[in-house]
């Protein structure tokens, strides 16, 4: 096992512990709490994959951080902070929409890279809006927190979320997953639109009809999904 992988996990565990103390003292805002919950799931998955105990890793991570801080000058810390771009947190969804439990009548789940896509196949002939909470850096989507599909009535009918055991994803991973989600919903004659905020930071533009400009790869993937569905329907007949 690579030593850098282990030490990175140990430091992440300790930093999560510090952030948890901030939340316990009611000093964190909603985006801070969202990231804390997401990272908790990620750390559990990484710990299971690496075969490492989180509590023990936290103690070692504390020692690593304390050693670095002891050697770090205030001037070097200031220069590092000034040269590091800050990410922003974008919220399409309210806290209630983000945390609400939802249920599927005809559930379908698909893993697309490091992202999990869930769709309720029972939903038909609805107008659906995709909304997401995510972080942005350099005016581009950095990390997806959660994406959900809402009907006009406010019901949740689809979702894209990072896999806890597979941390890290790219903007292309997110766009590919959105293409799969849209394809799955549109096959049941639903009309799907993407929020202007998500269009702007994921694709760098927005369409009047709310549809994201899919890449040729995404279009081919949707076409393969369509052909597969047609074959299944024929076999069922």
From Swiss-Prot:
Its main location: host cell. GO terms for molecular function: protein serine/threonine kinase inhibitor activity; RNA binding. Residues 205-237 are annotated as: Disordered. This is Non-structural protein 1. Belongs to the influenza A viruses NS1 family. It comes from the Viruses. The dsRNA-binding region is required for suppression of RNA silencing. A motif (Nuclear localization signal) lies at residues 34-38. Residues 180-215 are annotated as: CPSF4-binding. GO terms for biological process: symbiont-mediated suppression of host cytoplasmic pattern recognition receptor signaling pathway via inhibition of RIG-I activity; symbiont-mediated suppression of host gene expression; symbiont-mediated suppression of host mRNA processing; symbiont-mediated suppression of host PKR/eIFalpha signaling; symbiont-mediated suppression of host type I interferon-mediated signaling pathway. It comes from Influenza A virus (strain A/Beijing/39/1975 H3N2). It is found in: Host nucleus; Host cytoplasm. Inhibits post-transcriptional processing of cellular pre-mRNA, by binding and inhibiting two cellular proteins that are required for the 3'-end processing of cellular pre-mRNAs: the 30 kDa cleavage and polyadenylation specificity factor/CPSF4 and the poly(A)-binding protein 2/PABPN1. In turn, unprocessed 3' end pre-mRNAs accumulate in the host nucleus and are no longer exported to the cytoplasm. Cellular protein synthesis is thereby shut off very early after virus infection. Residues 217-237 have a biased composition (Basic residues).
